[in-house]
């Protein structure tokens, strides 16, 4: 009888182990789905070169990235990505679709802050109301801090010099950490602004890409592609981890300030939209 009791006693524990194991296994697909949704929020900023499509879709020029911040189709990017359109021309964003090639949507320039190199776009028609594969990213309410783990997420065409819409963009994920803050001029004849340095370098086409905190998956900054280090000594002071020139990002607080001035709402991590009602 004692042997029978000994053999049956562990069953509740076994059931609990199985239950937790099943729950853990069931959580994995959700995590993967969340991870995939990050890329769905990012769009290449482009200029359409053709009036009608070819067998490969529309031919376009690629300038950088933008990302959605709410369900109304508003996006953030860095202002210098839009320099080509200062004297005219219509920017577009390349938006993913389910079971179809990406589609070009017009991107209206809503507001630009050249001093802090941030800008707001709005895609029309609103891709969140159609059959598009889109998502939005929350904006962090706390600034990035030194040593914080981050990831920069960007898209670029497979062929930069011969890009067409029927070719799905390639995804780049650059992981690293925040090194330090510096003050620099982001535009001629304007006051200095803050940027924070990244432990990884920035490559061509990453301008305007979101920099997300790994823990919250909220945007803490935008990749600043034209920033250059002025002193090799400063590199050594910033970190001994990376021998290459570090990348830089515009703090998200500058973009949030521009959104507030335009009364445009955004999302914070696991919260309803912030600020005033969306225009």
For each feature predicted by the language model, list its residue ranges.
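Bacterial N-terminal signal peptides
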Residues: 12-22
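Protease-domain processing segments flanking chymotrypsin-fold serine proteases, especially trypsin-like
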Residues: 25-61, 275-279
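A conserved glycine-rich beta-strand in the N-terminal activation segment of trypsin-fold
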Residues: 30-31, 52-78, 103-105, 208, ...
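C-terminal cap/linker of serine protease catalytic domains
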Residues: 30-35, 90, 129-130, 156-160, ...
């Amino acid at each position: 009888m004692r042997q029978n009791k000994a053999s049956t006693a562990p069953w509740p524990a076994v059931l609990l182990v199985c239950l937790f194991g099943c729950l853990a296994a069931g959580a994995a697909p959700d995590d993967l789905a969340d991870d995939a949704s990050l890329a769905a929020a990012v769009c290449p900023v482009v200029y359409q070169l053709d009036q009608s499509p070819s067998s490969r879709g529309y031919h376009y020029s690629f300038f950088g990235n933008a990302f959605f911040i709410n369900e109304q189709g508003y996006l953030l990017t860095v202002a210098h990505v839009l320099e080509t359109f200062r004297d005219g021309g219509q920017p577009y964003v390349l938006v993913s679709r389910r079971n179809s090639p990406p589609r070009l949507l017009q991107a209206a320039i809503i507001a630009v802050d050249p001093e802090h190199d941030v800008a707001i776009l709005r895609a029309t028609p609103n891709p969140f109301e159609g059959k598009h594969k889109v998502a939005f990213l929350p904006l962090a309410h706390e600034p990035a801090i030194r040593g914080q783990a981050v990831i920069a997420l960007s898209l670029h065409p497979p062929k930069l010099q011969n890009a067409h819409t029927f070719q799905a963009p390639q995804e780049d994920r650059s992981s690293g950490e925040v090194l330090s803050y510096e003050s620099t001029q982001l535009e001629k004849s304007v006051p200095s602004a803050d940027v924070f340095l990244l432990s990884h370098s920035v490559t061509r086409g990453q301008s305007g890409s979101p920099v997300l905190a790994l823990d919250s998956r909220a945007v803490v900054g935008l990749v600043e592609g034209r920033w250059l280090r002025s002193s090799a000594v400063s590199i050594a002071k910033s970190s001994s981890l990376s021998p290459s020139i570090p990348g830089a990002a515009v703090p998200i607080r500058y973009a949030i300030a521009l959104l507030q001035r335009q009364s445009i709402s955004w999302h914070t991590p696991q919260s309803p939209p912030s600020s005033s009602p969306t225009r």
